[in-house]
Amino acid sequence: MSEPRIRRAEIAREQAHIDRVYTRLAELRSQAQKMLAKGYQLGHGAQREAVFEQASMLFERDMMVYHANQTLQTLDAEYEGLVFGRLDHAASGEAVHVGRLGIRDADFDNLVTDWRAPAAAAFYQATAEEPMDVVRRRVIRCSGQQVLDVDDDVLMPESLPDGMAVVGEGALMAALGRARGEHMRDIVATIQKEQDDVIRAPWQGVTEITGGPGTGKTAVALHRAAYLLYRHRKRLGGAGVLVVGPSPVFTNYISRVLPSMGETNVELRSLGTVLDGTAAEHIDPAVVAAVKGSVRMRKVLLRAMRAAPPDAPAQLRIRYRDDVLRLEPAQLDRVRRRVHARGGPPNRSRVRAAETLLEALADVAEKHARDDGGELTPAARRELVIELGERIDFHRFLVLWWPELHPAEILGWLADERRLAKAAGSALTAEEITLLSTSFADRSAGYSVADIALLDELRVLVGKPKRRRSAARPPEPEAGRRQRPEHYDEYSHIVVDEAQDLSPMQWRMVARRGRYASWTVVGDPVQSSWPDPADAESAAAAAFGGRTTRRRFTLRTNYRNSAEIFALAARAVAGQAEQDQLPVAVRRTGLEPQVRPVSQDTMADEVRMAAGELLDTVGGTVGVISAMDRVATVDKWLATMADERLHVVGSLDAKGLEYDAVVLVEPQGLIDESVTGRRVLYVALTRATQQLIVLAADPLWLPS
């Protein structure tokens, strides 16, 4: 039988099984909908029952509705590409189909094995050297319910039964050539053994994943999160998983990966949105971001918080019987220092501040009594403290002198250069103080990403104010939905992507979300844009606390870039990295990257021309990458090219992204924007999977 006929026959054979799977899926969905309807009926019936029975029925309703909703969400999320693989075992002759979730028929016979189950591990781990009893491994490519193609690997040729067909070019190489879309796809069908070892590593402690561009670090980390939730749902599912990425562009890019695997109990945050209620995208100039990210800022913020607010009264004057008691500025400063010296956040220390003020006033009254030849007895002192403590004028002063502090307010105070200099002391240089105060004063673009870690630090320093308990009953949660408490920021597992770029202050911010969590940390030192890697490494170690279990995996195969493109990127970072820190590209396309000399005067036309060429050539996305301060200009140049496949991004926002083709605008601009400019350039050069055009006005950007 010819190859095309064999392929068609094998596709038809798999289609028959896929049809059975989707028929069963429809049955399971119908059952879940019936359970959902029954749950809501229980809720209506509970209104007619006694209180005890009512509570029991409402609990039963919530559990039934919750589980029905979860089942429906899972079934709907896994609909596309539900089955993607098959294992044929040599010893038993059994065929195991692998997919996004496990499905059994009405007789409990296995139709699909969940990719995270131990029985599916051989799909990713079996090799010709260690076949794990797998004679044939098949990747099944589907669109909806239709089988489009199959690709086979024979792992035990000597055990291949007569009549067992083998077709295809190899699933991985086929996937590498496929066009990219706006969002990252999951890689459950093409996970390689070195990646699978990381995904299935134990949950405890800290798992570090290092590797160069295109090694699949991000995809592996996300699949690891899905695997851990599947295998340890009771342990990790309660508080959920937090995934922290470098930018909103990146988190949007990866946003569909985990839902496509049925995992919804995952929070995706960029560094600018880790703090609830904030959404920062603005990037500070590198020199400013370096100061804001330094751990030195903790001392600066602590001193700023402990200083008197700018509008606090400078003097306390209060009448007590026939005497006028005064606390002058120096005395008030001593009182403030005394309160802070006893520890505790200021928003929970107002009572202590009031007590210390009253004692200071009593000291003044005692001095007045001695000056007049008398004394203030202990009983009279207690009486003074009680009476003044009940006076409305004292409490008016207290509210102004020791107000409830808000992080944004304190950060705003530091726009005053003199106030910032006082808070900084010797922690910052005069130049750094000027840079920071100017940055804090300019709020035209809102908070910067680096500001968010400072706000979070202040949030912890000032503390939550004490609140009176409300008699109001909290609203009843919506049936079927798991409610996360407001401002609850603890997670069971934390994934940090592009970890090499986190500043020490950002590490402190993320660490607060995972004091009792296990961690998956993804990064590549060669791509780091943080100027002091040792400083950041120390902060990361502090974030992990006393966790003694730390395991490191290094991914060495670059599946994204062609060998031709990566060779150029490696030249750009020569001298910045050791050879063993660079990955190895596994495929050649015969297409060399184009480096086009241009002038600044013709740059706009050249960018439009290059983008148009690539849109005509590739079937997927085209990225246009420039220095951060040039993004808006480049965006205007391309405004007339209405193509949703075209994306303009800045050098720092390009981290973690990939495109079928890339236009890199003036590489020297990326080098000049920070002290780690060559590493940033390396990142930009490794975003393309197929074609790369570099437009360079400065010819000295590439080392000879």
Map each language-model feature to its residues:
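Non-catalytic, well-ordered alpha-helical scaffold segments
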Residues: 19, 81-84, 185, 196, ...
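Alpha-helical nucleic-acid-binding subdomain
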Residues: 104, 109, 229-495, 501-512, ...
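Extended, charged low-complexity regulatory segments
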Residues: 1-188, 192-197
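Phosphate/oxyanion-binding active-site loops and adjacent basic polyanion-contact surfaces
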Residues: 183, 187, 217-221, 297, ...
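P-loop NTPase Walker
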Residues: 1-4, 9-36, 143, 162, ...
